[in-house]
């Protein structure tokens, strides 16, 4: 299948009447930008409609670095019924890579799901079936603004910037949902948690109360809270989830038989519960090795990654790095008098 065939498989344009369209292109490099713009152009009958459909290019993948939504602030000055449509290039690993899990070469050349420009061109040329163009579910500016105003302050001088960041985060949500249909449910991960919390109205009101009670400027408290978020917020990725599963398999093999015995019917029942309700899984363990069993079973059954709470003393070099990128949340053993830590 060549690139032209991929372009014709589906259209990035949403169903609409006379509404304008704003495309958000989630790109990591110039090649992905080229692919997505070519996809848009391929389905533009006259070519003139592109001028009525602004395109904002953002790298939405860096949770820690944040995102520069300045372009989006200006682009959102569009009619309220404008449809915002996010686009992304999804890269599937080779069947060999899926079966083997992360390999040494992946540490050298990077995650096969996130290739650079040169590697991406090579994959498209030699293994085009691994390249997918995906569009997230579109939504109107009006609907997004209504949802934003329910939980965020609109009086703040940074309201427009916060709204643009909110729109970008919603683009991540719908794109991740579309990509999981290709990659698998085990890769459902939270994104931009700290950024969402910092702009949340309820959280800001709680910080305001602490500022009033202690006399500490809010800006200083928010800076302190950002440090707590950096410690606690897990930043999982597809690569490290795969690596953690492989690591668990290796460790469990040191003390147990290769096959893990469990009740498949109970797993399916739990899947339904987790799908329909916020859930907390509690399991016993005699050793730290036992704590690897449940995450491994869930991974093998294509469950969303479970968040695992652990003491901050476990956040040491090596293991802390891995767990932080595989769903681990480290909290202090004692924070009785630290109200800011509690609300964070």
Give the location of each predicted region.
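Membrane-interfacial terminal anchoring regions of lipid-handling membrane enzymes
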Residues: 1-344
């Amino acid at each position: 299948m060549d690139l032209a065939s991929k372009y014709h498989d589906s259209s990035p344009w949403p169903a609409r009447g006379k509404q304008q369209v704003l495309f958000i292109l989630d790109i990591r490099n110039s090649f992905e930008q080229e692919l997505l713009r070519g996809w848009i152009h391929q389905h533009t009958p006259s070519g003139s409609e592109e001028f009525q459909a602004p395109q904002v290019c953002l790298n939405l993948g860096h949770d820690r670095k944040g995102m520069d939504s300045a372009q989006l602030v200006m682009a959102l000055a569009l009619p309220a019924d404008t449809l915002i449509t996010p686009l992304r290039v999804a890269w599937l690993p080779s069947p060999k890579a899926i079966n083997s899990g992360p390999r040494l070469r992946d540490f050298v050349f990077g995650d096969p799901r996130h290739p650079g420009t040169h590697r991406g061109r090579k994959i498209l040329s030699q293994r085009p079936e691994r390249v997918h163009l995906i569009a997230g579910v579109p939504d109107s500016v009006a609907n997004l603004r209504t949802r934003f105003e329910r939980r965020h302050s609109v009086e703040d001088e940074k309201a427009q910037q916060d709204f643009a960041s909110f729109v970008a985060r919603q683009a991540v949500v719908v794109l991740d949902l579309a990509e999981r249909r290709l990659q698998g449910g085990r890769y459902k991960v939270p994104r931009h948690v700290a950024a969402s919390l910092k702009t949340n109205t309820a959280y800001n009101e709680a910080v305001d109360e602490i500022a009033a009670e202690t006399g500490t400027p809010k800006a200083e408290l928010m800076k302190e809270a950002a440090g707590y978020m950096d410690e606690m917020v897990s930043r999982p990725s597809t690569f490290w989830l795969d690596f953690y599963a492989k690591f668990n398999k290796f460790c469990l093999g040191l003390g147990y038989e290769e096959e893990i015995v469990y009740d498949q019917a109970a797993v399916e029942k739990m899947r339904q519960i987790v799908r329909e309700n916020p859930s907390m899984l509690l399991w016993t363990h005699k050793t730290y090795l036992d704590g690897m069993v449940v995450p491994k079973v869930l991974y093998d059954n294509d469950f969303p990654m479970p968040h695992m709470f652990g003491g901050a003393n476990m956040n040491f070099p090596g293991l802390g790095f891995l767990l932080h990128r595989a769903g681990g949340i480290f909290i202090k053993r004692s924070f009785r008098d630290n109200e800011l830590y509690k609300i964070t």
